[in-house]
């Protein structure tokens, strides 16, 4: 992400940790650095907004994700990502560490034939 003279950001290939650092510079909530509750609540709210936009595509657009709907969902996904980045940082994790651990878990499940089903420790 590159900041333009206009103050807007331009998308460029970036590492997750670079995103997390840039996102942190915009964090303005109570007790930043020692408050995992705020980003957790924000994350659930934003995930709900994603679900609501998808629901409205089903209800109002016959399930067609046209460019307008896709753009609206993209913006909400960005908000989800922002809160994931904040929560990870509040818990002492870099986003790349979280992403790597997630892929390791999924690859292990595939290798053991346990990708389907439920439960954290399958």
Please report, for each region that a protein language model flagged, where it lies by residue.
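Flexible "arm" and connector segments at domain edges
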Residues: 1-122
